[in-house]
């Protein structure tokens, strides 16, 4: 193992160094106020009263970095020019919030600072290829490898932690950013610190565009600073939580469910479920805080997204064991109040039923692998998202993880089936050989041998032939499946149930596919490894379903799942757009149902009411109680499953099983 690989491995190993704090023990209803400099004179009692009225119990608000909201004595740290003389706004909010049992998390942003700091210490700052700094609205971008992050920031944090009994700290825009707020690329940092460190590690110059080595370099650099910040917080305020957009060294893993006008379609209505599920199952000892961003895009921070999108994210976060959150820009005195008025009743309902929203863990027996940020490789979202959708629409309870900690050790968990898209690491072999089942749907070969690879074609516009309809009952009305994209040819081992049809003529109509030829090239293989098995679909099933939603691809997935996982953990007649999460909490099981039927193309509308949803959950449960629409359901035990009917689903329902 190389020194570079070892350092990254140690950073990943240390990612579990989190304390068991209030964020894991208490139900969280979290409001983030992204304060402007001009908000430095806000009425602290009014803000705390507004938070208490909506039953928020955590507020994340501006503390320092770009602008301090308290008097600071640290050189090169500046209070907001709008902070009234003699006023300590942050201290006032802390006092008023704590008086109402509301925790306060301070927000810092060390990614940018004033020109005066640049003039005094130009070596602390991000430098583009030609040596010029990155300037946005008069603020200069710092570098994660420079003295601002690695020295000055620690002085600022030390003062803040000594002065205030904060409940936690959060860090915005952590590390070097590749684009500014307007979306303009700024390139890679070529400051002296970065160039020297990169050359020492990789024995070459920083590239013009990011490659695998550079991504690892940035990953390692940011985690070094994250570790130092974590150590400082735990030294000075051991009861305070550490929250960041990374997994390593933190207590809470931050993410955002947000929108952007230039983001490629289709929209991703599972955003909060995706983020929270992944964080809670990748790092079970850390809290997932997916920020419910109410604004449309940076240019329109005061215009809110649809009410139903805000509500959907809220239910998804709670259903997957994460914090209920809401973000605003400025104070709660908003010009567009639609999103705020949408979440207020959800916050109040969650407070009235908070006993169900702390200490949840996934009960799923199927695992979907995401891709880790520290691998150096880039992975497309489409294959993963397509498999995520298929699992949700088939109502298969599943956990998501982007590491292999679950294979062995303290975090070991047992799964009946593991599903992977483009990331299939070598550690999966241990899981399979011990008796596990793995479904791999990707043209990328796994990091261990399943079948001999002949070659990979990057773009195949052909078909998959169904040779054995008995194996695929969902495909009884079709002999062909669309194939578009990369395809890996592997060695055949007997007759294949699915085979490749390569591209053929597509026009004019008189010549369409007149030269179509079948092959014996398998489009799916199954191999035994030790006590377990691997089923490999060597093409992009997930990506095609994500983009095109073809029933044939869904049918193939359904039939493969039935073969690999015949004893389903959950069976239901629910519509595919009813999302279901199966969770454990102490001695009871929680079944969350979320109605996604209001999502259509680029819109979110009130969901269509669902009635008489029949559910069978593996296990012997004697009682089933609905919470959103209170009621006791009749439970029958059939073949090892407990059967009951949910009479009505509007936006969300919670069923308590005992």
Q: Predicted segment positions?
A:
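Short, acidic/polar
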Residues: 38-53, 149-160, 245, 306-314, ...
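Catalytic domains of carbohydrate-active enzymes, especially glycoside hydrolases
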Residues: 43-68, 163, 314, 390-396
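Aromatic- and glycine-enriched glycan-recognition loops and surfaces
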Residues: 36-54, 76-101, 150-151, 224, ...
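N-terminal carbohydrate-binding accessory modules
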Residues: 18-52, 112, 356
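Sec-dependent signal peptide recognition
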Residues: 1-9
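Aromatic-lined carbohydrate-binding/catalytic grooves of carbohydrate-active enzymes
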Residues: 50-88, 112-137, 178-193, 246-260, ...
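Active-site-adjacent "subsite" loops/lids of carbohydrate-active enzymes
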Residues: 106, 110-164, 173, 194-219, ...
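Carbohydrate-binding surfaces of carbohydrate-active enzymes
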Residues: 20, 104, 211-658
């Amino acid at each position: 193992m190389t020194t570079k690989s070892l350092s990254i491995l140690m950073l990943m190993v240390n990612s579990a160094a989190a304390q068991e704090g209030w964020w894991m023990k208490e139900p969280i209803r979290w409001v983030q106020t992204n304060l402007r400099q001009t908000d430095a004179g806000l009425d602290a009692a009014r803000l705390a009263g507004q938070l208490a009225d909506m039953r928020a119990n955590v507020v994340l608000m501006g503390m320092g970095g770009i602008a301090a909201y308290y008097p600071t004595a640290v050189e090169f740290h500046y209070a907001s020019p709008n902070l009234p003389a003699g006023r300590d706004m942050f201290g006032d909010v802390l006092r008023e919030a704590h008086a109402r049992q509301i925790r306060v998390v301070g927000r810092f942003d060390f990614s940018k600072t004033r020109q005066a700091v640049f003039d005094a210490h130009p070596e602390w700052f991000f430098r583009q290829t030609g040596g010029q700094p990155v300037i946005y609205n008069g603020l200069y971008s710092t570098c994660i490898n420079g003295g601002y992050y690695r020295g000055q920031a620690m002085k600022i944090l030390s003062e803040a932690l000594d002065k205030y009994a904060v409940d936690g700290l959060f860090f915005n825009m952590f590390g070097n950013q590749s684009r500014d707020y307007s979306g303009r690329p700024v390139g890679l940092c070529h400051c002296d610190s970065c160039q020297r460190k990169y050359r020492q590690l990789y024995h070459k110059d920083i590239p013009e565009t990011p490659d695998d080595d550079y991504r690892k370099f940035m990953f390692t650099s940011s985690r070094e600073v994250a570790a130092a910040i974590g150590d400082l917080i735990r030294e000075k305020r051991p009861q305070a939580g550490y929250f960041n957009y990374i997994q390593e060294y933190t207590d809470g893993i931050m993410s955002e469910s947000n929108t952007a006008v230039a983001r490629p379609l289709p929209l991703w209505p599972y955003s909060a479920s995706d983020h929270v599920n992944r964080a809670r199952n990748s790092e079970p000892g850390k809290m997932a805080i997916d920020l419910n961003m109410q604004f449309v895009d940076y240019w329109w921070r005061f215009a809110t997204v649809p009410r139903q999108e805000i509500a959907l994210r809220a239910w998804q976060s709670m259903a997957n064991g994460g914090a209920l959150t809401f973000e605003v820009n400025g104070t709660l005195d908003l010009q567009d109040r639609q999103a705020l008025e949408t979440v207020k009743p959800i916050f109040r309902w969650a407070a009235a039923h908070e006993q169900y929203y702390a200490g949840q863990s996934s009960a799923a027996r199927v695992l979907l692998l995401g891709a880790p940020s520290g691998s150096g490789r880039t992975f497309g979202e489409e294959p993963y998202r397509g498999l995520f959708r298929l699992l949700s629409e088939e109502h298969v309870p599943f956990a998501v993880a982007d590491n292999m900690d679950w294979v062995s050790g303290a975090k070991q968990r047992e799964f009946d089936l593991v599903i992977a898209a483009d990331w299939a690491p070598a550690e999966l072999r241990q899981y399979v050989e011990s008796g596990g089942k793995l479904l791999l749907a990707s043209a990328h070969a796994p990091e261990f041998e399943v079948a001999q690879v002949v070659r990979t074609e990057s773009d195949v516009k052909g078909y998959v032939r169904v040779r054995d309809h008995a194996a695929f009952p969902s495909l009884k009305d079709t002999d062909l499946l669309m194939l578009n994209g990369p395809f890996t040819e592997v060695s055949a081992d007997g007759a294949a149930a699915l085979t490749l049809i390569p591209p053929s003529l597509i026009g004019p109509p008189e010549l369409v596919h007149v030269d179509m030829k079948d092959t014996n090239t398998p489009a799916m293989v199954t191999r035994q490894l030790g006590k377990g098995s691997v089923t490999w679909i060597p093409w992009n099933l997930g990506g095609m379903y994500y983009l095109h939603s073809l029933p044939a691809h869904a049918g193939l997935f359904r039939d493969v799942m039935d073969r690999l996982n015949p004893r389903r953990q959950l069976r239901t007649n629910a519509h595919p757009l009813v999302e279901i999460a199966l969770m454990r909490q102490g001695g009871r099981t929680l079944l969350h149902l979320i109605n996604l039927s209001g999502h259509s193309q680029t819109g979110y509308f009130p969901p269509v009411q669902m009635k008489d949803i029949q559910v069978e959950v593996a296990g012997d449960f004697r009682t089933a109680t609905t919470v959103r629409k209170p009621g006791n359901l009749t439970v029958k035990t059939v073949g090892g499953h407990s059967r009951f009917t949910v009479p009505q689903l509007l936006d969300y329902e919670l069923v308590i099983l005992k």
